[in-house]
Amino acid sequence: LIGQNPGLLIDNCASGGRRLDIEMMKRSVPLWRSDYYVSGNVTDSDSARSIGYNLSYWLPLSCGGSTTDGLGTSYDFRCAMGSGMTVDIPVSDFGWWSRRVDEYFRIRELMSGDYYILSQGNVTNYTKKNACYEYIDPESGEGCLILFRPEGSLAEKQTFYLKGLDPDAVYTLRVSDNGEEITASGKALSDDGLTVSMNQPRMSLVIFFSEK
């Protein structure tokens, strides 16, 4: 098909994502990576997050599904994020939705850079353990952390060790949710880590960082 139609785009939408294999990925784009989508159900949100979180190691470009009802919190919205995302924005509370979409577009620019999973045990225990992953543009030094405390996690505070930083550079980190800013060296963020507090279950944070 591609040989006869140069530039043809083929959507890999078979078996709920079970055909995301190397040969198919050479020839197609996964516009629907799984039949799990963010619908407002707690399990669906965390499952969709885990799929994107782990799949991004091997397949950075993919898209998942969501419903308007399912994206009503920052936690659920961020569970649905990927390099592609479906969003049906309601008229009500347009300002909140606009902020979420603006934040997403900023994160998406970083998704083609380097990707690191900074938390452990999130393949099988993704509903009970905090999650943190990092995107960073190695050329500009700009990046972000996306953090989740799922319903079943008892950990209000956790330290994460950033990767891909210049140890001699100083970084400004800004929490997207409340505007809080700190500065720290790349060496300190990598060696000593960044301690983050999430004081309630089903809480999520996005932290952007850049070299000063």
Q: How should each PLM-predicted stretch be described?
A:
Residues 184-212:
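C-terminal beta-strand-rich structural cap/linker in extracellular carbohydrate-active enzymes
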